Amino acid sequence: MMTLEKFEEASELVKKVTNPTKLVFSEYLSTQTGAKVYLKPENMQHTGAYKIRGAYYKIGTLTEEERNRGLITASAGNHAQGVAFAAREFGCKATIVMPTVTPLIKVNRTKSYGAEVVLHGDVYDDAYQYACKLAEENGYTFVHPFNDLDVATGQGSIAMEIVQELPTVDYILVPIGGGGLITGVSTLAKMLNPKIKVIGVEPAGAASMTAALKAGEAVELDSANTIADGTAVKEVGDQNLPYVQENVDDILLV
């Protein structure tokens, strides 16, 4: 269950490994929309993305025994680097399963944080299934990229920073892949100020959250086609869906 106490704990914990990402006013977007538009530059984090937040908080909630067993995850990029970086900070071993088509630069960056990288399968789903197999065979602790409420709580620390810096915020727009980010951000935003509108932005060619909301449950798409590979998820997390149903006001397809 996601609680304000856990969000506050996560927000303090992730400060140890995140860079301050102050809101940046966009004159161009503000002119185009007729509103005051600010950007949250999470690309300025150590690993180049917000994923370090969820990975670090999740690993921080684990017992010493769970960490000592070694961590494992599957990812084609940002979550891989987030888990690798966080595992290094906690002094534990991490194994990252990545698709064989993962760009070499992402593989090398993940390795640079001390993780063991295993290349398997052509797509994320292949890598994920193999990671689950390795976790079962070796007793590793799995750190899911999005279908985990502790991971989502860590990502939600973004909302804490937005509201603290801009208390008058009316709308928060959040990209959707598997649903972890928008689960955390929307839930905390509504806790802090129920008047805030949270709008999801999802690829039209990988609209797995839209499909889940229509069906009332997580469903698997036949394919996920989008240039935004970080949001190319065929099935959203079933743990995330109830929070999205309750806290997200609308989803835009692009």
Q: Where are the language model's segments positioned?
A:
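PLP-dependent amino-acid enzyme catalytic core
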Residues: M1-V254
